Amino acid sequence: MEVPRAHGVRAIAAAAEGQDGGAGCDEGAEITLAHGSPLNEDQYIMNMRDAWAPLQQMTTAVTFVGHTHVQGGFSQKEHEWHEIRPRIPVRRDRWALAIPPGTRHLINPGSVGQPRDYDWRAAFAIYDSVACEVTYHRVAYDVRAAQGRILKAGLPERLAARLKEGR
């Protein structure tokens, strides 16, 4: 499978060779991965204003972004715009989001090591291109051990403190 690169953005076929991969999805099997925004790898996408231009210029139905360390995203269908902010209570560990045909989604899976949305648990997402669904996950981990490794490495104390605060 060939992976084209352009300005820090990679378009990747979601299915392995010989698999259907995303037959139910409107835009086919391709997704886009970007560190910040698909338009600028250093851009933070924090709100609908930031998401507007990337959503307008997306060439795939789903684009995964990061940079903010905040789990969630944004969606657009015609003239409807929505912010996606999964609030996963400590008693739950996942939240599913359907990707309906005809929509575009900017998805931030969150951060395993440094969440910045005031939830200390590790955050990630799994994309199912056949079911057309993104499942956001939260997983508890040994924060004290991680804080100890940060301090032992000689890194600033504030980096260790922020882990338990999720910011």
Whereabouts are the PLM-identified features?
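Short beta-strand scaffold segments in enzyme catalytic cores
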Residues: 21-25, 71-75, 123-127
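Acidic, His/Gly-rich catalytic cores of divalent-metal-dependent hydrolytic chemistry
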Residues: 79-167
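Active-site environment of divalent metal-dependent phosphoester hydrolases
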Residues: 39-41, 64-76, 98, 114-119
